[in-house]
């Protein structure tokens, strides 16, 4: 199996979601490992703007030809945008997992970031699972 991608500038949860901080906004998506394990993604159910999410709690669902899985927020805060393009092209999560953010969140705590994994630590976690 090819080495899992975990680019610099991203932090990861043990549930395989990623977060990329841009100023006071956090973009959230799923990792390369997660999309590969799920297989062809056919549907993504995401929250509307204004919803509050809490760290490590569910914020939506993702469905593939193999399974349906909950999505977990790596940081908490207020959803300011959901990626509507994924409703038309959910397969983008497979082909571009780090460009296919699912939600944008504001109001997260920087202390929450300390509970996440660096790319190196995430790769080590995934290596144990493969």
Curated annotation (Swiss-Prot):
Residues 25-106 form the Lipoyl-binding domain. It comes from the Bacteria. CDD domains: GCS_H. Keywords: Lipoyl. GO terms for biological process: glycine decarboxylation via glycine cleavage system. Its cofactor is (R)-lipoate. The modification N6-lipoyllysine is found at residue 66. Binds 1 lipoyl cofactor covalently. One of its GO terms (cellular component) is cytosol. The glycine cleavage system catalyzes the degradation of glycine. The H protein shuttles the methylamine group of glycine from the P protein to the T protein. The glycine cleavage system is composed of four proteins: P, T, L and H. Belongs to the GcvH family. HAMAP family: GcvH. This is Glycine cleavage system H protein. It comes from Leptospira borgpetersenii serovar Hardjo-bovis (strain JB197).
